[in-house]
């Protein structure tokens, strides 16, 4: 009886999802349209029945060690490819706005150019053996399905974090005046008195302000950089008057004159050896979620993600593996929208 019930419940849930989708027009003979719920349109060949509850788990997942979304804010898009909207320098131009009686009013046009973007599809399936489900059912508060989804989403999110870090720490992505490489005693790991992280950050802030008219609001560093930065004599000397024994991200952010000081603690397996995702870099940037209603703001980067993603497809039973399978799919792509809104310090520490 229990075996039959265990097998029947997911099928009943599947049938119910299909019935609800058909009733509300989400599922039809020709296509599966989830626009009303998730903003997704799929043809028959690529049709998926979505588990809305588990998709909510995947979409709400956040790893506190990941900082990429702070430099590349999430922007929902309705297509897997399109143009990145960028705006010109019209806001900073000086116009002759004087008008004589009866004369025509001068006009300006906000021009924009678009760089292409294409979302990447990433999928992974979480496997939960029947035995685990049976044992977890006897312990209140354990949700193996949710745990399986979060494990898969953590892997997908780590890949995205790595992609964001790679974009942000590649010197070729920045214009000539928006990057520098520290060497020798100029590196922040040198405490002999030559290195000066506060001065270096000020140079970066001014380089950004001179090009976009706004001061950066975010500084992001790798874990190795933070380990030295928080102990740097010039940092320690500045914070000693605050009554604090050690530098915190909040204190250093205030010292640098930015809203956010981000520490990239994420690591990844690099051929059997763990390595920091954010390396020995420092990224300074202005990052805000611009909208067309605001006529755009010169943000450093965005993370374009298809509406309603990541999503969890209807779980299915693998009799050979004696497990339930939870497929998770993401359609996402981080992009640098305005490289003049960022500044890269390479080799910040030795």
Role assignments for model-derived ranges:
Residues 17, 34-37, 160, 164:
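Polar, enzyme-active/binding microenvironments
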Residues 218-222, 262-263:
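A structural signal for short, well-ordered beta-strand segments and their strand-loop junctions
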């Amino acid at each position: 009886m229990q075996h039959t019930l265990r097998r029947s419940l997911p099928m009943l849930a599947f049938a119910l999802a299909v019935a609800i989708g058909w009733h509300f027009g989400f599922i039809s003979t020709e296509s599966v349209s989830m626009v009303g719920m998730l903003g997704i349109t799929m043809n028959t060949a690529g049709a998926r029945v979505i588990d809305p509850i588990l998709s909510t788990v995947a979409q709400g997942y956040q790893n506190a060690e990941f900082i990429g979304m702070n430099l590349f804010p999430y922007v929902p898009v309705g297509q897997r490819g399109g143009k990145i909207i960028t705006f010109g320098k019209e806001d900073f131009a000086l116009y002759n706005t004087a008008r004589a009686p009866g004369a025509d009013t001068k006009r300006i046009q906000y021009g924009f150019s678009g760089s292409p973007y294409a979302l990447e599809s990433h999928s992974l399936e979480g496997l939960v053996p029947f035995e685990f489900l049976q044992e977890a059912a006897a312990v209140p508060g354990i949700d193996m399905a949710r745990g399986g989804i979060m494990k898969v989403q953590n892997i997908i999110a780590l890949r995205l974090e790595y992609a964001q870090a790679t974009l942000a720490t590649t010197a070729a992505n920045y214009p000539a005046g928006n990057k520098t490489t520290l060497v020798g005693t100029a590196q922040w790991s040198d405490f002999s008195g030559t290195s000066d992280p506060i001065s270096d950050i000020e140079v970066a802030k001014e380089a950004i302000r001179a090009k976009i008219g706004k001061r950066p609001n975010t500084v992001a560093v790798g874990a190795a950089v933070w380990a030295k930065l928080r102990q740097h004599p010039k940092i320690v000397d500045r914070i000693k008057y605050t009554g604090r024994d050690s530098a915190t991200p909040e204190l250093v952010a205030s010292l640098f004159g930015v809203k956010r000081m981000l520490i990239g603690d994420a690591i990844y397996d690099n051929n059997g050896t763990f390595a920091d995702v954010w390396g020995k870099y420092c990224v300074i940037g202005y990052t805000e979620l611009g909208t067309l209603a605001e006529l755009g703001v010169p943000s450093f980067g965005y993370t374009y993600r298809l509406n309603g993603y990541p999503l969890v497809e209807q779980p299915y039973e693998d009799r050979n593996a004696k497990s339930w399978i939870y497929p998770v799919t993401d359609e996402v792509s981080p992009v640098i929208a305005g490289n003049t809104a960022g500044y890269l310090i390479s080799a910040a520490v030795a």
